[in-house]
Amino acid sequence: MIFNVLTIFPQMFPGPLGVSNLGSALKKGLWTLNVFDIRAFANNKHNTVDDTPYGGGPGMLLRADVLGRCIDEVLSLHPNTKLMFTSPRGVSFTQDIARQTMNFDNITLLCGRFEGIDERVVDFYKLQEVSIGDYVLSGGELAAMVIIDTCVRMVPGVIGNAESLKQESMEGSLEYPQYTRPASWKGMEVPEVLLTGNHGEIEKWRRNASLSITAARRPDLLKDRYGENDVE
């Protein structure tokens, strides 16, 4: 699986993507990271990549001509790549969208900066806009890392224990509480059922705990899974 990242801060990568399981998988060639410096496509003395928005307003926008040259370079190397743009106005990047993204062998992520990018770039290249949450970041690099992390960990061989992927959160409910040694800590005991060895009862406890946490913290997930009336 190949990821191409377009950014004005190439030094940010691989960053956290270069450590732990993902870093080892990167070194083994289970996935590939190509970083493109947008400033290299500025074609001007000062490597200027931004300009003021037409119609006025605060901040600066990444220029269409600069981004266009960068994207065209990527497309010349990877003509079948999926083009994505990290944007606070994009669709929420969920586990389902991550799985859909995994249908592509090559993915390109354009990282926004300043007040955004010229809208013509989105329209011309038909960029899929994705958001990792209802908040504003200084740039799209961190969002790109989140997206890459979410996808790469589903690549076979990246996560050592494949069973971990099957028990992941966000499958319609949040994860149940987990405990390890010592069994007693600061007067707090591990739930007795987890010490019984009765796998049927343990599974039942975990399922109920998961549903309780989800109902309290993310009832929207249960409504999506079971419907409005069943949750209430």
From Swiss-Prot:
One of the GO BP terms on file: tRNA N1-guanine methylation
InterPro entries: Alpha/beta_knot_MTases, tRNA_m1G_MeTrfase_C_sf, tRNA_m1G_MeTrfase_TrmD, tRNA_m1G_MTases_N, tRNA_MeTrfase_TRMD/TRM10
GO molecular function, a single term: tRNA (guanine(37)-N1)-methyltransferase activity
EC numbers: 2.1.1.228
Superkingdom field: Bacteria
GO cellular component terms attached to this protein's record: cytosol
PANTHER family for the chain: TRNA (GUANINE-N(1)-)-METHYLTRANSFERASE
Protein name: tRNA (guanine-N(1)-)-methyltransferase
Lineage of the species this protein comes from: Bacteria, Pseudomonadati, Pseudomonadota, Alphaproteobacteria, Rickettsiales
Gene name per UniProt: trmD
